[in-house]
Design a protein with these regions (language model features):
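Hydrophobic, small-residue-rich alpha-helical packing segments that form membrane-like cores
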Residues: 7, 15-23, 29-39, 53, ...
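Soluble metallo-hydrolase cores and metallopeptidase-like ectodomains found primarily
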Residues: 1-65, 75-86
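Solvent-exposed loop/turn segments at secondary-structure junctions
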Residues: 5-6, 28-30, 45-47, 57-61, ...
């Protein structure tokens, strides 16, 4: 609710512990609309082997963090790669996804529709060609005490080795960057992963912002953190370079088997 309405409720609660109110809201849904995923490429020496960068451009209200800064981050990384004269081995695909926040009527599973349709309907041939999806969410905001890359199990070992060999990056958190797994259903990397594309995302679910400002009119530039934003540019641009140097896709399947075994033992 708005600050104005909240102030009125707080005033009513000044002299009593609880009150009963009537909430009157009207939502209008326009059915059968078309949205567009927007795709660009930096051609590589091997056009059929790709690294995908993804972020969604739809939002609730202004969506400054969620997810406009992420779309801008993709452009920033792409510009840095081009300006550096980098000639990738893999084709770098940049995809601004639609319908992440909402895209299906009459369903409990109404989000990440654009990404789902991108990989299952528009480009199912990407499976087996995209060696990694680097998805971005709320990248200009501090989440907890460290940056984290939330990854599918198969990339954890490679990412841990990558982080161990990193040069000094912009200092934005008191603790060192870490890897966590598995991925979650909150974001577009999940739709990619269930199709068979190994995926990861900057971890974004920690911190009070998610409880007080997420998906509200308060998601604006007031919470812009330049140091965190710079760190994510550096962290993922260098990750693209590291992935591009691999002759064989660096997937490690033993963590998946271990997780399956653990799940069976708990049954």
């Amino acid at each position: 609710i708005s600050r104005k309405d909240a102030a009125g409720l707080l005033e009513l609660l000044r002299d009593q512990e609880e009150i009963t109110v009537t909430f009157d809201a009207e939502s209008r849904v326009t059915r059968n609309c078309t949205t567009y995923n927007i795709v660009g490429r930096i051609p590589g020496k091997h056009p059929d082997r790709m690294v995908l960068l993804s972020a969604h451009y739809d939002s609730y209200f202004d969506g400054f963090q969620d997810d406009n800064t992420a779309v801008a981050l993709m452009f920033g990384i792409a510009k840095a790669l081009l300006d550096s004269g980098f000639q990738p081995n893999n084709t770098i695909v940049i995809c601004a996804m639609a319908s992440e926040e909402w895209g299906v009527v009459d369903s409990n599973f109404d989000w990440s529709t654009g990404a789902y349709e991108q990989i299952f309907t528009a480009h199912p041939e990407w499976v087996g060609k995209v060696i990694a999806d680097l998805n971005f969410e709320l990248p200009a905001l501090a989440h907890g005490t460290r940056a984290r890359i939330r990854s599918c199990y198969e990339y954890v070992s490679f990412l841990e080795e990558y982080l161990a060999d990193l040069p000094n990056l912009t200092i934005a958190y008191p603790e060192e960057t870490a890897v966590t797994s598995p991925i979650e259903t909150w974001s577009d990397d999940f739709s990619m992963a269930i199709a068979g594309v190994p995926s990861m995302v900057n971890d974004f679910t920690g911190g009070s912002f998610m409880e007080t400002h997420y998906h509200s009119q308060f998601d604006n530039d007031e919470f812009y953190d330049e140091q965190v934003y710079r760190l994510h540019h550096e962290l993922f641009a260098l990750l693209i370079l590291a992935l591009d140097e691999t002759a064989v896709v660096p997937l490690q399947f033993s963590p998946v088997v271990q997780r399956i075994r653990k799940g069976l033992e708990q049954c």
